[in-house]
Amino acid sequence: MTRHFGALIPSTNTTCEIEYSHLLPPEYQAHYGRMMSSSPTKSPFSSPLDADLDYQAKLLGTAKVEMVMLVQTSASLHSAGYDAEVTKRMEAASGVAALTSATAITRAIKALKAKKVALVSPY
C-alpha cells in the first residue's frame, strides 16, 4: 500500500523533489506544494512564503495525503513559537496532521536517544 504525504517547499527549491524521489522507500510518495519565494539569496524565510502556506497546505489536503510537512529548516528561525503556530495552521488548512523540519528532527533525535548528532549541510 502506498502512503502519501505532502511537502511544502519554497518555489526556488529545485532539489527537494529529486532528493526525495531517491531517498524514499517505494511505498512512500511525496506530493509538493510550492510557496512563493522572491529570491533564493534573500532572507531564508519571508512573508511571501508564509502568505502561501495556508493555501498550499489546503491544496495538499485535497490530494488525500496522510500528513503535511513544511520542508524548510530556516522557518524555525522565522520567529519564536513559529513552529507550533505554523503546524496548527497547516493542520487546519489541510485537515491532516502536520510537521515542520525542526520538529521532525527533534522527534527523531529523541526517538533514537541520540547523545551526539552530526550535521552535514550544503549551507
Task: Please identify what each model-predicted range represents.
Residues 52-54, 98-113:
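Hydrophobic alpha-helical segments within soluble ligand-binding/sensing domains
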Residues 115-123:
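An alpha-beta-alpha
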Residues 1-55:
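N-terminal glycine-rich anion-binding loop in soluble enzyme alpha/beta folds
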Residues 39-42, 76-80, 108:
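Short active-site-adjacent helix-start/loop capping segments
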Residues 57-103:
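Glycine/small-residue-rich loop that forms an oxyanion/phosphate-binding "nest" at active or ligand-binding sites
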Residues 9-14, 72-80, 122-123:
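Gly/Ser/Thr-rich loops at beta-strand to alpha-helix junctions
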